[in-house]
Amino acid sequence: MVEFRIPEEISAFFDDEYGKILLVKGAPGSGKTVFALTLLSMLKGNGAYLATRVDPETMYKQHPWIKGEISAANIVDAAQSVRVQKAKEFTIKPLRYTDVPDFLKAIYARTESMEKPVIIIDSWDAVVSYTGYHAQKEREELEHSLCDFCRRTKTKILLLAENTEQTPLDYLADGVVVLESVMYDERRLRRMLLQKLRGCQIKNPVRLFSLDNGIFKSFIELKEEEEKEIAEPHPRAPIPDISDRRISTGIEDLDRVIGGYGTFNLFEGEYITYDIIARALSLNALNLGRSLLFMPWQEQIDRLMPFVEPKYRDNIEAVEDIKDLKDRIAGERRIIFINMEEIEDEEVVKAVIAKIRDHGDVVIGFTGADRGRGRFDFFASTHIRTMFISGVPCVCGEVPRTEIHALELDISTGNPEIRLTPIV
């Protein structure tokens, strides 16, 4: 199943009867075309995609999911000669723009029978060049005519542009969004900036998004109280160990990314994201019948009890002093959580961790970004960095090395489940 997600502000922007223009700006490779295809797919065929650089056959090969979502009749070759598919499933009739009236008539011909029509032009710069309106004054006249046309005919037009600088079109357009693709510690990071959406409230002006599987998917801020909204909480079937040496993280997606947890697992960075992941492990381990040991006690563990089998709810202990932890390392294999931010004596921590590893217990250690690097990572079997990006909890692996992944909380099953999506 293909999962789309467009920011709710943009969905609201298109969900009325008025004609308007949305200008989508971004450098090559920033995701403009995928965003446009995803949006048009969500509109259930009420629109047309005018491309000047990619023919429909190639587009279907690059984005296989759109063949079942967007009909060939709605993909228009705006600059090339007539193309007929070899299998003769469909014919693409080109639109030859020699002047402004013909250009507008061609658009109107594609939309006059549509309900709430939407036209996507990729790219506006190429179309303007093809029409021969190279002078700045002529281009501005064309853009004014296009704005007037869309309002008179109640047509919504989405213009894709690679010029990220501010131009007169920014003022004419009803909405302006900018897509960014930047490097973050040698990893891909994608953001959408909602600069203007006339008539719509912008709740979050910056949206983290991914193009995973060639689909545009934006992420929303995680609600801190979302778990409390579960009406009938109940335990879920736990995920078994990965192997004799690796246990499950309690998150299926994270298991696939890092292969589970080893003996010492270091989390470095932002605490709230770490806490989300630690709670997932706690629930899974408890429902497998394992015991947990915390140093120090974490108050938020109490709210996990509704999701734990009653017979396992007493399998939790706590110690307040790291030195007391050595005396508790005996007997069955346990999972031990250590907040190293609250411990000053680094050598004692290392000694305790070494003893725990020898016993075969699993250690989950957290430290802030300022203190973590270089202190414990040299003997970590897993090293995960935690962060918040545009209000979204994210992780990336140092050992093993991974892309940035966005975390989402799914409570639809009556149990908090974490899903990960790579930012690619």
Q: What do the predicted segments below correspond to?
A:
Residues 1-15, 248-260:
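Pre-Walker A adenine-sensing motif
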